[in-house]
Amino acid sequence: MESKRAIIAIALSFVVLVGWSYLADHMGWNGQPAPQAQQEETAPSASQAAPQSASQAAAPAPRAETPVFLPSAGREVTVVTPLYKAVLHSGGGVLKHFSLTRYRTAITAGAPAVDMVDTASTVMSPLGLLINGQPSWNTGQWSFDGGDLSLGAGQSGVLTFTGEVDGVRVVRELTFSADTYLISEKVRLAPLADARTVRLGFTVGTGNLSPNGGQYDHTRVAWLHDGSFSEKTSASDLEKGVLETGALSWGAVMSNYFLVAAAPVDTTGVTLKGKLQEGVYRVAMERGDVSIPAGGETTVACNYWFGPKDRGLLKEAPNQLAEAINLGWFSIIARPLVDMLEFFHKYVGNYGVAIILLTVVIKLVFWPLSHKSYKSMEQMKKLQPMLQKLREKHGDDREKMNEEMMRLYKTYKVNPAGGCLPMLVQIPVFFGLYQALLNAIELRHASFITHLPFTDMVWLADLSAKDPYYITPIVMGATMLLQQKLTPAPGDPTQAKIMMFMPVVFTFMFLSFPSGLVVYWLCNNVLSIAQQWWMLRKA
């Protein structure tokens, strides 16, 4: 009975995983926007912001007379680094393009670089400043006297945009660095006349970051509240708007692999507003009232991230931005697995081979447990004649039959569930690797065998995507059948039927799984078959 329950538990664990993915795709949880007839006020537009208190970096000392402001004609400003190419508009520093040099939209030759900004999101400003709830890039006049930036390794540069918005002189200083995707902003505010109090907000926005993500990758709004990661994926929820208050570290729009985030330096009294509208995902981190003394100046700062969810770089970012890489409940397993994959990849240069090496290591770790389990199955095989007699003798009295069976197991020191232990132990590793493959930017477009042998057909060129020809899941199912042939058949007819259908169920489940995960399970099956064969020969 215990063995039967354990096997059913294993099957249910995998069914839950697939069922969740199915529901996410078919019940409107996929982050795809529904069309809207008209464009209304977006949630990040601050007309609904409640007044809040906030500490400011104020400099009340008198300063020189404000120079005459001369608006300039709008033009494009370009920032080029080894990591990206950014194009901004001088009218308020609106971001028009942010192309990632090292990441392509597809694995095909000539595919364009991933652009974190699209035309629709440019209208709503993916790198904007809200003043009194209004978009400063639309309501003010701006000037820019600088030039383009071209940054080499280790270099940084500053673009300064000056404007007059709602009676306030606004100076936006954006600092770009060649070695990170972090953009740092300092906003200097000075009243044109008397002391002023304004409400300030930092906004980021983008289009769909996962156009080809399918049911496993959705664009969503996420945030870190009091050190705890939260997100909303449902398109219907995002269209209604998201409002969060409290100890917020950052707000973001993200997919499995890419991140657009705003992280105010001073998070006191910050409110997050998020919304999906007209195909644009937008987040605003809005502050409370900012006091600007007459003749003085107030400085407020914010950091932005436009780029991949690169663990190494995000670890160096402020406001715990590294928590944007959320690996779920199995993160304690997934993170070491990613580290091991990186270690192997550093030496072999192929993530498919790295997964195979990782599988071998995991198999060696679990070898003693597997060995004990297979011995238990062999003992169960020897007990089958006695178990069959008990069934015939107590067939009408299941309670008595189970009692006699347990006495028999105890006499021969056999654990009826022992044969299931290797699979049960591997389930956390399976889910950990599943999360790692879905969320590790290192594995996006990572190849194993790029073409089918002796053909030009692209095959396992992206281990984070499914096998396009379903070869690996079918072979994996065949190895499960072979493994069953080497395993003693369960005495319970119901249990035997469940085991018979397991390879079929697993094969269909794995058809849409990332091919890297299928390679792991296939390799694990082959090693298990080799171990069983070795034990049978030894016996």
Curated annotation (Swiss-Prot):
<dbReference type="Pfam" id="PF14849">
    <property type="entry name" value="YidC_periplas"/>
</dbReference>
<feature type="transmembrane region" description="Helical">
    <location>
        <begin position="7"/>
        <end position="27"/>
    </location>
</feature>
<dbReference type="InterPro" id="IPR047196">
    <property type="entry name" value="YidC_ALB_C"/>
</dbReference>
<feature type="region of interest" description="Disordered">
    <location>
        <begin position="32"/>
        <end position="64"/>
    </location>
</feature>
<dbReference type="GO" id="GO:0032977">
    <property type="term" value="F:membrane insertase activity"/>
</dbReference>
<comment type="subunit">
    <text>Interacts with the Sec translocase complex via SecD. Specifically interacts with transmembrane segments of nascent integral membrane proteins during membrane integration.</text>
</comment>
<dbReference type="InterPro" id="IPR019998">
    <property type="entry name" value="Membr_insert_YidC"/>
</dbReference>
<keyword id="KW-1133">Transmembrane helix</keyword>
<dbReference type="InterPro" id="IPR028055">
    <property type="entry name" value="YidC/Oxa/ALB_C"/>
</dbReference>
<dbReference type="InterPro" id="IPR001708">
    <property type="entry name" value="YidC/ALB3/OXA1/COX18"/>
</dbReference>
<keyword id="KW-0472">Membrane</keyword>
<dbReference type="Pfam" id="PF02096">
    <property type="entry name" value="60KD_IMP"/>
</dbReference>
<dbReference type="GO" id="GO:0015031">
    <property type="term" value="P:protein transport"/>
</dbReference>
<keyword id="KW-0813">Transport</keyword>
<comment type="function">
    <text>Required for the insertion and/or proper folding and/or complex formation of integral membrane proteins into the membrane. Involved in integration of membrane proteins that insert both dependently and independently of the Sec translocase complex, as well as at least some lipoproteins. Aids folding of multispanning membrane proteins.</text>
</comment>
<comment type="similarity">
    <text>Belongs to the OXA1/ALB3/YidC family. Type 1 subfamily.</text>
</comment>
<keyword id="KW-1003">Cell membrane</keyword>
<dbReference type="GO" id="GO:0051205">
    <property type="term" value="P:protein insertion into membrane"/>
</dbReference>
<feature type="transmembrane region" description="Helical">
    <location>
        <begin position="418"/>
        <end position="438"/>
    </location>
</feature>
<dbReference type="InterPro" id="IPR038221">
    <property type="entry name" value="YidC_periplasmic_sf"/>
</dbReference>
<keyword id="KW-0812">Transmembrane</keyword>
<keyword id="KW-0653">Protein transport</keyword>
<dbReference type="GO" id="GO:0005886">
    <property type="term" value="C:plasma membrane"/>
</dbReference>
<keyword id="KW-0997">Cell inner membrane</keyword>
<protein>
    <recommendedName>
        <fullName>Membrane protein insertase YidC</fullName>
    </recommendedName>
</protein>
<feature type="transmembrane region" description="Helical">
    <location>
        <begin position="498"/>
        <end position="518"/>
    </location>
</feature>
<keyword id="KW-0143">Chaperone</keyword>
<feature type="transmembrane region" description="Helical">
    <location>
        <begin position="347"/>
        <end position="367"/>
    </location>
</feature>
<dbReference type="InterPro" id="IPR028053">
    <property type="entry name" value="Membr_insert_YidC_N"/>
</dbReference>
